Curated annotation (Swiss-Prot):
Mg(2+) binds at residues 44, 120, 123. Keywords: Cytoplasm, Endonuclease, Hydrolase, Magnesium, Metal-binding, mRNA processing, Nuclease, RNA-binding, rRNA processing, rRNA-binding, tRNA processing. Its main location: cytoplasm. It comes from Mycobacterium leprae (strain TN). The gene is rnc. PROSITE patterns: DS_RBD (PS50137), RNASE_3_1 (PS00517), RNASE_3_2 (PS50142). This is Ribonuclease 3.
């Protein structure tokens, strides 16, 4: 096993057999280009169920007074593509994307940082962990990796809309409405956008994406983290 892959396993806090880990990292684009190898989609299916059950159970016990509808909204703020991608990007140096096995086409179009691909990869790895170690180990891994999002669930919008969540946070702290400065580079068919979020004349985060929306969401995510929401939900000062 290469050191980079061991670093990924260290981020999850588990060991996996080489064959199972490789399968969990194999995107269908890579499998297609290599003669129809097995893909990580079955593991993704399994991991999605394990993640949903674990988060649902945790929220049920954390919030005994919440209604079914409220619990569903809290779960939606944690179990969604953007939340999974957020965790994936912060796993280790370079995030999950650098470990994924992608086809040339996906690689050339930035697939290693596409939220949907990162989310699918997270679910497939969680499925692999469940398959090899069982539900209790998988549960512990999920609660550790998603713990800060679980803590912050009451402050997040459904679908982890970082711009909305950041605006709600700054409003609650009397910091006004965030503004975004967006620039772009590259030809029309392959533009790259950079967004910087400013709150009270101070830059709190930046993000790069293949669309203005993606760049702004990443910038808002960085700003939300910079304001210590993830490190201390409920703080009233920066």
């Amino acid at each position: 096993m290469t050191q980079p892959r061991q670093a990924l396993l260290d981020a999850f806090g588990v060991d996996l057999p080489d064959e199972l880990l490789s399968l969990a990292l194999t995107h269908r684009s890579y499998a297609y280009e290599h003669g129809g190898l097995p893909t990580n989609e079955r593991l993704e299916f399994l991991g999605d169920a394990v993640l949903s059950l674990t988060i649902t159970d945790e929220l049920f016990h954390r919030h005994p007074d919440r209604s079914e509808g409220d619990l569903a909204k809290l779960r939606a703020s944690v179990v969604n593509t953007q939340a999974l991608a957020y965790v994936a990007r912060n796993l280790s140096d370079g995030g999950l994307g650098v470990y994924l096995l992608l086809g040339r086409g996906e690689t050339n179009t930035g697939g290693a940082d596409k939220s949907s691909i990162l989310a699918d990869g997270m679910e497939s790895l969680l499925g692999a962990i469940y398959l090899h170690h069982g539900i209790e180990v998988a549960r512990q891994v999920i609660l550790r990796l998603f713990g800060t999002l679980l803590d912050a669930a009451p402050t997040l919008g459904a679908g982890l809309d970082w711009k909305t969540s950041l605006q709600e946070l700054t409003a609650a702290r009397g910091m006004g409405v965030p503004s975004y400065v967006v620039t772009s580079t590259g030809p029309d068919h392959d533009k790259e956008f950079t967004a910087v979020v400013v709150v009270m004349d101070t830059e709190y985060g930046s993000g790069i994406g293949h669309s203005k929306k993606e760049a702004e969401q990443k910038a808002a995510s960085a700003a939300w983290k910079a304001l210590d929401v993830l490190g201390g939900v409920g703080k009233t000062s920066v």
